[in-house]
Amino acid sequence: MTSILQVALLALIFVSFALVVGVPVVFATPNGWTDNKGAVFSGLSLWLLLVFVVGILNSFVV
């Protein structure tokens, strides 16, 4: 169970880093928001899902 938590946490860290770098780039490019709105919302949905998964898995490990 601990290794599953570690993998989920690592995925959360990678998605967070990608969003921290990617979202400002999307807003800085011309027509970036209209062209990449779906990708940003998909990334945010994945991030929110991973936050809940890590929280639930953490309750089983601790």
Swiss-Prot record:
Statement: the UniProt record of this protein carries the keyword Protein transport: no
Conditions for induction: Transcribed as a monocistronic and dicistronic transcript (with downstream psbM).
Signal peptide: none
One GO cellular component term noted in the UniProt record for this chain: chloroplast thylakoid membrane
Record's subcellular location: Plastid, Chloroplast thylakoid membrane
Membrane topology value: Multi-pass membrane protein
Superkingdom classification of source: Eukaryota
InterPro entries reported for this sequence: PSII_PsbZ (IPR002644), PSII_PsbZ_sf (IPR036512)
Location, primary (coarse class): plastid
Alphabetical UniProt keywords: Chloroplast, Membrane, Photosynthesis, Photosystem II, Plastid, Reaction center, Thylakoid, Transmembrane, Transmembrane helix
Segments passing through the bilayer: 8-28, 41-61
UniProt note: phenotype after gene disruption: Not essential, grows like wild-type at 25 and 17 degrees Celsius and from 20-200 umol photons/m(2)/s. Loss of PSII-light harvesting supercomplexes. Loss of PSII-light harvesting supercomplexes without a decrease of major antenna proteins, at 17 degrees Celsius and 100 umol photons/m(2)/s loss of minor antenna chlorophyll a-b binding proteins CP26 (Lhcb5), decreased levels of CP29 (Lhcb4), less extreme pheotype at 25 degrees Celsius and the same light. Altered phosphorylation state of PSII and LHCII, impaired non-photochemical energy quenching.
GO process terms (BP): photosynthesis; photosystem II stabilization
Subunit structure: PSII is composed of 1 copy each of membrane proteins PsbA, PsbB, PsbC, PsbD, PsbE, PsbF, PsbH, PsbI, PsbJ, PsbK, PsbL, PsbM, PsbT, PsbY, PsbZ, Psb30/Ycf12, at least 3 peripheral proteins of the oxygen-evolving complex and a large number of cofactors. It forms dimeric complexes.
Family: Belongs to the PsbZ family.
Function, as annotated: Controls the interaction of photosystem II (PSII) cores with the light-harvesting antenna, aiding in the dissipation of excitation energy within PSII. PSII is a light-driven water plastoquinone oxidoreductase, using light energy to abstract electrons from H(2)O, generating a proton gradient subsequently used for ATP formation.
PANTHER family to which the protein is assigned, alphabetical: PHOTOSYSTEM II REACTION CENTER PROTEIN Z
Name this protein carries in UniProt: Photosystem II reaction center protein Z
Source organism (scientific name): Chlamydomonas reinhardtii (Chlamydomonas smithii)
Gene: psbZ
